[in-house]
Design a protein with these regions (language model features):
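Transmembrane alpha-helical insertion/packing segments
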Residues: 1-70
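Juxtamembrane interface at the cytosolic side of transmembrane helices
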Residues: 175-190
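Functional transmembrane-helix hotspots
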Residues: 97-135
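Alpha-helical transmembrane segments with an aromatic anchor "belt"
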Residues: 68-88
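Alpha-helical transmembrane segments of multi-pass membrane proteins
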Residues: 14, 18, 22, 81-93, ...
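Individual transmembrane alpha-helix segments
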Residues: 143-173
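Hydrophobic alpha-helical transmembrane segments in multi-pass membrane proteins
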Residues: 22-27, 86-98, 171, 175
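Structural signal for membrane-spanning alpha-helices in multi-pass inner-membrane proteins
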Residues: 30, 34, 58-62, 94, ...
């Protein structure tokens, strides 16, 4: 779709590509924060606000697209489509970074994150075992947590390309979900 209605002659696709660059940069920062807070459960709670910021950025981007290039009107489906495209392009930028980061910059990163996850479950198991004498529920959780630890230990560490593709597919999926809520809101200028 090459709709050109602004004086500079910018097409919708050009707008989406230019908007995807800063969004991809935000995704890279989000990945680094998530990556380096993986060992702390409380810092892991940052994921929800970061996802909310993604929704706000998508809303602002699609609203700007609507106002600058589409005469202030956009259908819900077109808004949803552009939002998913924006998440795809931004996700491609993030995926390229994730691949380069995990393959060349910090090749031990994925192993470290995997080992931190195993250590978190082992720490949780120790805590649950300490509570087992006081609670039947805690005692019933011990076999499940032990099984999860064994599964994690047996699971091979993801490669850099697997991680990049996984994050790209996550970005597209989250884009679909977020835009299902954002598209009806951004449809027309009030």
């Amino acid at each position: 779709m090459n709709i050109t209605v602004n004086p500079k002659g910018v097409t919708v696709n050009q707008f989406l590509m230019k908007t995807a660059l800063p969004l991809g940069g935000y995704f890279i920062i989000e990945y680094l924060i998530r990556n380096y807070t993986a060992s702390n459960i409380f810092l892991g709670l940052l994921n929800l606000p970061m996802m909310a910021v993604t929704a706000v950025l998508l809303f602002l981007s699609i609203r700007k697209l609507r106002d600058l290039l589409l005469d202030g009107q956009i259908s819900g489906f077109v808004a949803w489509t552009f939002g998913v495209q924006l998440m795809f392009f931004a996700g491609l930028i993030e995926a390229a970074f994730i691949y380069l980061f995990n393959e060349f910059l910090v090749p031990t990163n994925l192993v470290t994150v995997h080992n931190q996850l195993v250590a978190q479950y082992e720490s949780a198991l120790t805590t649950i075992e300490g509570m087992a004498s006081a609670s039947n529920m805690a005692a019933s959780m011990i076999p499940m947590v032990k099984e999860m630890i064994e599964l994690l230990k047996d699971t091979p560490v993801a490669t850099a390309i697997e991680t990049a593709i996984s994050m790209l597919s996550n970005d597209i999926f989250y884009g679909m979900l977020i835009m299902a809520f954002v598209a009806p809101i951004v449809r027309k200028k009030k």
